[in-house]
Amino acid sequence: MTAPWADWDHVLKIDPDKSLVDGETFDDIAQTGTDAIEIGGTLDVTTEKMRRVIDACRTHEVPLYQEPSNPAVVVEDEALDGYLVPVVLNAGDPFWITGAHKEWVRIADLDWERTTTEAYIVMNPDASVAEYTGADCGLDADEVGAYATVAERLLGQEVVYVEYSGTLGDPAVVEAAAGGVDDAAVFYGGGIDGYDAAYRMGAHADTIVVGDLVHEAGVDAVRETVSGVRDAQAEE
């Protein structure tokens, strides 16, 4: 069966701890052209905040996923198409490689059919997720490519996520990740602030993830990133 993200060029990540731009709604977000909406954040995330976003998005046809930062904020809701659970391969703290996941699998009636792990490679040392997980961000492109191969070949991961949260990354690093896998999808996130950045990273990643932009600049800016990645993918 083909994975849903096989057809995704663009994912919009909503941080439940952040507000939308004044005057904009989740109805507007659903009309940006994004392929999926992912709800997740690193700091100050609660189930109540998660539910608020889920409730606001439940009536739209855009696929809706939760990316919980820890098992305590998992929300069971039929409006969700699934759960994307990060495994931080370069975490300094093993809790973020298997420890949190040990707790995850103890959730009663865990819906395995809708649960997928994402093999994160965190690359921005100043990002909250890097500090939170103690990630070794001093990796070169070859090392990132090797981590991507580990993710797919040794760990059976379907998604490799190169995360530069808060800053635009090195396209050569994303290209190396793509070169390290055969079938796994390569996601890229971080610093996508407009058409050019989306085009640049979309030339190497299968899917770009846009987050802060929707909270800081709004839906028109998000639409530009959708156009950028689609144009890049069309040229491949």
Swiss-Prot record:
It comes from the Archaea. Sn-glycerol 1-phosphate binds at K13, Y161, V162, E163, Y164, S165, G166, G191, G211, D212. Its cofactor is Mg(2+). GO terms for molecular function: magnesium ion binding; phosphoglycerol geranylgeranyltransferase activity. InterPro entries: GGGP/HepGP_synthase_I, GGGP/HepGP_synthase_sf, GGGP_HepGP_synthase, GGGPS_halobacteria. It is found in: Cytoplasm. Prenyltransferase that catalyzes the transfer of the geranylgeranyl moiety of geranylgeranyl diphosphate (GGPP) to the C3 hydroxyl of sn-glycerol-1-phosphate (G1P). This reaction is the first ether-bond-formation step in the biosynthesis of archaeal membrane lipids. Cannot use sn-glycerol-3-phosphate (G3P), glycerol or dihydroxyacetonephosphate (DHAP) as substrate. Monomer. This is Geranylgeranylglyceryl phosphate synthase. It comes from Halobacterium salinarum (strain ATCC 29341 / DSM 671 / R1).
